[in-house]
Design a protein with these regions (language model features):
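Small-residue-biased structural context
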Residues: 1-159
Length: 159
């Protein structure tokens, strides 16, 4: 089940001053809140919402991380490699939880995701993303819907 302590929420002090990236970050917080709600009292109707929210989370992780990484590459950001490593480590943690849920159906495990996402994101934005504040601009960032990147429709991959 989900944890009883409240989820961190988006606050304006988390802004990196890049509109589309801020919008992505806000969407992560909203998605975590939805996941928190649907894992609190799961029933058969909620199982569909859980799976849907997991699919959206996977798409958002892949698409948002690629969006940021492309913008950092375009801006010749000095800490791109380290930033990618932080993204990859988080994505791996989330993937392991999702795989466990899909294999076992454990609502308890998937119920840890909302806090994992918001706690990680809150820290990551304040510490890691804050380093590119003032370096990345709206002009650096691909503002297409994340599905283009998450679905592999993007041709300028970061390696």
């Amino acid at each position: 089940m989900n944890q009883t302590n409240p989820l961190p929420e988006w606050t304006d002090d988390l802004s990196v001053n890049v509109e589309i990236i801020d919008e992505d970050h806000q969407a992560f917080f909203r998605l975590a809140a939805l996941m928190n709600d649907v894992t609190a009292t799961p029933d058969n109707d909620q199982l569909y919402l859980i799976e849907t929210s997991i699919n959206i989370l996977e798409e958002y992780i892949e698409g948002h991380f690629l969006r940021e990484q492309k913008a950092m590459a375009k801006a010749d950001y000095a800490y791109l490699v380290e930033h990618i490593a932080a993204h990859d480590a988080f994505a791996d943690r989330v993937t392991r939880i999702i795989q466990d849920y899909r294999q076992t159906g454990s609502i308890e495990k998937i119920g840890t995701l909302p806090h994992l996402v918001t706690d990680w994101l809150n820290n990551h934005i304040r510490v890691v993303d804050a380093q590119y504040k003032g370096i990345l601009t709206n002009a650096n960032v691909d503002d297409r819907p994340l599905v283009y990147m998450a679905a592999g429709l993007d041709t300028e991959l970061v390696s």
